[in-house]
């Protein structure tokens, strides 16, 4: 009787034969943190405690696939749980992660939690104030105003003197120069916008001066500022899937999108 090929053994042999190649591509190395660096929920009983994560692999010696092309997660019975093809010159980015998560042709392994610790654990250094005394309007032409000493809200107003005026301070990080982290301060005060969890109101917190360095738990004061035409978005650094948002008859909060409004128009020179 013909011997049934052991696919998992082939995978191990392929990796062993190409160990020297893997050392030249550290960002795909098994010595580095896994591309899927999250805690996964329980798999089917037949696969529990049997899955392995390979950063790079060939499927078998006879497959003729090049060593550089694939990234897979397989179980010991040879079932491919998740895969993504990459070239050696392709860096792993947030877009890679998002594309994999949204690809309907791939089997999704849902995590219990997937914190963006690589963002919140960075150190951010203050550069300078880049905008002074601007107003934020949402797409319903509501203006952000003070609800009380601690919270903000949005309302249709006729007198712009009621509007909150913000200053925007820019920060930088040596590890990621593709985003623009900013801090939002109520003009002529030392009150700073601070993020909480989803659907929780943003807070106004007082600090003696603008922080020169922000890291760890203090990243709730930072937001990635993105612009698309006249639309402006403020994405929480502490919660990178949540935006500053307005909601009907509610405080300004953090939200993923509708029914909350996450895009704003910046009105400058309103002093």
UniProtKB/Swiss-Prot annotation:
Instruction: Note the superkingdom of the native organism.
Output: Eukaryota
Q: What InterPro entries has UniProt attached to this entry?
A: IL-1_alpha (IPR003295), IL-1_CS (IPR020877), IL-1_fam (IPR000975), IL-1_propep (IPR003502), IL1/FGF (IPR008996)
- A Gene Ontology MF term for this entry? copper ion binding
Q: Where Phosphoserine occurs, residue numbers?
A: 87
Protein localization: Nucleus; Cytoplasm; Secreted
Q: Does the keyword Glycoprotein apply?
A: yes
* Assigned GO CC terms: cytosol; extracellular space; nucleus
PTM description: Acetylated within its nuclear localization sequence, which impacts subcellular localization. Proteolytic processed by CAPN1 in a calcium-dependent manner. Cleavage from 31 kDa precursor to 18 kDa biologically active molecules.
Query: Where are the glycosylation sites?
Result: 102, 121, 137, 141
Record's comment describing the protein's domains: The similarity among the IL-1 precursors suggests that the amino ends of these proteins serve some as yet undefined function.
In which family does this protein belong, per the annotation?
Belongs to the IL-1 family.
- Name of the protein: Interleukin-1 alpha
Organism placement in taxonomy: Eukaryota, Metazoa, Chordata, Craniata, Vertebrata
């Amino acid at each position: 009787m013909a011997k049934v090929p052991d696919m998992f053994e082939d995978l191990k042999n392929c990796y062993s034969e190409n160990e020297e190649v893997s050392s030249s591509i550290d960002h795909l190395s098994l010595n580095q943190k896994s591309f899927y660096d999250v805690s996964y929920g329980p798999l089917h009983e037949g696969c529990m405690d049997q899955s392995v994560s390979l950063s790079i692999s060939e499927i078998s010696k006879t497959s003729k696939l090049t060593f550089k092309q694939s990234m897979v997660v397989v179980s010991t019975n040879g079932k491919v749980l998740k895969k993504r093809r990459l070239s050696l010159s392709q860096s792993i980015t947030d877009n890679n992660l998002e594309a994999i998560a949204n690809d309907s042709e791939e089997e999704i392994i849902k995590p219990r939690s997937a914190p963006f610790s690589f963002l919140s654990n960075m150190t951010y250094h203050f550069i300078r104030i880049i905008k002074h005394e601007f107003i934020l309007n949402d797409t319903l032409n509501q203006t952000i105003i003070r609800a009380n000493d601690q919270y903000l809200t949005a309302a249709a107003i006729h007198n712009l003197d009621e509007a909150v005026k913000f200053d925007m301070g820019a920060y930088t990080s040596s590890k990621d120069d593709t985003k623009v982290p900013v801090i939002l301060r109520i003009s002529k005060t030392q009150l700073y916008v601070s993020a909480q969890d989803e659907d929780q109101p943003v807070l106004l917190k007082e600090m003696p001066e603008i922080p020169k360095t922000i890291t760890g738990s203090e990243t709730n004061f930072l937001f990635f500022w993105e612009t698309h035409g006249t639309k402006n978005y403020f994405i929480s650094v502490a919660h990178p899937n949540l935006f500053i948002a307005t909601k009907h008859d509610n405080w300004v909060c953090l939200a993923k999108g509708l029914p909350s409004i996450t895009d704003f128009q910046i009105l400058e020179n309103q002093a």
